[in-house]
């Protein structure tokens, strides 16, 4: 029954199994039903195992990254504590250096002041010594100038004798 399908004839249903390829379709569907699950199952199982392995690897990396992050946070807090300790120590050290510098400056100023006072007193001592020397020289000169007028022969003899006696006693 090979009837041509014409546009005028309308829609028709072909019930001949050999002409419609229903048997071919049945064989293909049965083959797919029978062999495809094992073939696709193996492929899907391999893919599933690969995905699970990648997930496990990603979880391991996440765990390691989390541990590294915690360690880094701990190290950061330790470093911050150490930095604050170093800062506090440096502030104490700078304060002690400043105090020591001030103390040395005060001591140096006192030493300079004492030196100035000492120089002043030694200068005064020198001036007094110079004045005494000049006064003694002036007194000796005056005495020598007035001595010839005051000394007569007997006084001169008495003075010489007394000087000799003083020398002999010593």
UniProtKB/Swiss-Prot annotation:
Its main location: membrane. CDD domains: ATP-synt_Fo_b (cd06503). InterPro entries: ATP_synth_b/b'su_bac/chlpt (IPR002146). Signal peptide: none annotated. It is found in: Cellular thylakoid membrane. The keyword Oxidoreductase does not apply. Keywords: ATP synthesis, CF(0), Hydrogen ion transport, Ion transport, Membrane, Thylakoid, Transmembrane, Transmembrane helix, Transport. It is a single-pass membrane protein. One of its GO terms (cellular component) is proton-transporting ATP synthase complex. GO terms for molecular function: proton-transporting ATP synthase activity, rotational mechanism. Pfam families: ATP-synt_B. PANTHER family: ATP SYNTHASE SUBUNIT B, CHLOROPLASTIC. F-type ATPases have 2 components, F(1) - the catalytic core - and F(0) - the membrane proton channel. F(1) has five subunits: alpha(3), beta(3), gamma(1), delta(1), epsilon(1). F(0) has four main subunits: a(1), b(1), b'(1) and c(10-14). The alpha and beta chains form an alternating ring which encloses part of the gamma chain. F(1) is attached to F(0) by a central stalk formed by the gamma and epsilon chains, while a peripheral stalk is formed by the delta, b and b' chains. Belongs to the ATPase B chain family. F(1)F(0) ATP synthase produces ATP from ADP in the presence of a proton or sodium gradient. F-type ATPases consist of two structural domains, F(1) containing the extramembraneous catalytic core and F(0) containing the membrane proton channel, linked together by a central stalk and a peripheral stalk. During catalysis, ATP synthesis in the catalytic domain of F(1) is coupled via a rotary mechanism of the central stalk subunits to proton translocation. This is ATP synthase subunit b. The gene is atpF.
